[in-house]
Regions:
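ER/secretory pathway lumenal C-terminal domains and tails of membrane proteins involved
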Residues: 2-71, 75, 79-283
């Protein structure tokens, strides 16, 4: 809209000078060039992302931290899912990993994409996805539908997604699902399963009393000098997961490994506030 009105503004300037000047195009052209230069000068620093590699680093490090043929369940569209789809399909990066967007499971077209890209996973989900898609159809057509039935089928399907795949594929769940939907009881794990903090994600395990190893935090995420909401989100998310992993290591008396994760936070994510009690445990 602003660009639309700017064009009319430029035309108005040209028309004014055309009737009062012998060289009607010189001054308006100079004003337009000056306006462009000022816009570039005042906005370039803020909008220039040519040296920002945070999203690539975060996405690749997260996916690389998972085991082969793993399933990653998330709805971090801006930070993880859409970049991962790009790197998988354009750069052939870790195409073995199945990345499923929790929110896109609410859309019928997404199941065609899952069936095309991951027929094994989508096929096992069919007994639960087909009733959901049938209940979803009137909603997508703006017809009368049952929101209670739709939500019940949706929640059941998410739980079955874990249950029917966790024995054949490593299954990882992103922290936003744990902190939100699982905390509110909108998404539950199959009976007998629990979560262990891994490096960037939570891993679904059958016996949480047995120690589950994770990779060393030897990844690198390049953070830009100028922070915005997106960069801060990644910084806080990674910091929180590393702290959770450190606390998990402490639970099994792996003090040195716990220190390793905390030192990673202090060194590379200094803005993240480590819990005071955890800091004191090492002092």
């Amino acid at each position: 809209a602003l660009s639309f009105f700017a064009v009319f503004g430029v035309l108005k300037v040209f028309s004014l000078f055309k009737s009062t000047s012998e060289n009607p195009y010189v001054m308006p052209a100079a004003l337009v060039v000056l306006f462009i230069i000022l816009q570039v000068y005042f906005n370039h620093k803020e909008v220039n992302k040519s040296s920002t590699y945070t999203f690539e680093d975060y996405t690749k490090a997260l996916v690389e931290s998972t085991e082969k043929n793993s399933i990653i369940f998330s709805y971090e569209w801006d930070y993880l899912v859409s970049p991962a789809y790009y790197f998988q399909n354009v750069e052939n990066f870790r195409r073995d990993a199945v990345i499923i967007d929790k929110e896109l499971l609410r859309r019928s077209w997404y199941y065609n994409q899952l069936m095309r890209n991951h027929p094994g996973v989508a096929g096992r989900l069919k007994p639960y996805s087909e009733p959901f898609l049938k209940a979803l159809l009137p909603f997508e057509r703006s017809e009368n539908f049952s929101p209670e039935l739709l939500e019940t089928l949706y929640r059941t399907m998410m739980t079955k997604l874990v249950e029917d795949n966790v024995e054949s594929r490593p299954f990882y769940i992103a922290s936003e699902l744990v902190e939100n939907e699982m905390a509110r009881g909108e998404f539950t794990l199959p009976k007998g399963y629990s979560l262990v903090p891994d490096l960037f994600l939570f891993k679904v395990v059958k016996d949480d009393s047995t120690y589950v190893p994770a990779r060393n935090p030897d990844f690198t995420i390049r953070l830009p000098k100028y922070r915005d909401h997106y960069i801060s989100f990644i910084e806080n998310t990674v910091g929180a997961m590393l702290v959770r992993r450190a606390m998990y290591e402490m639970k099994f008396d792996h003090t040195e490994r716990a220190k390793m994760y905390l030192n990673k936070v202090k060194k590379e994510f200094p803005d993240y506030q480590i819990p005071y009690s955890l800091e004191q445990a090492f002092n």
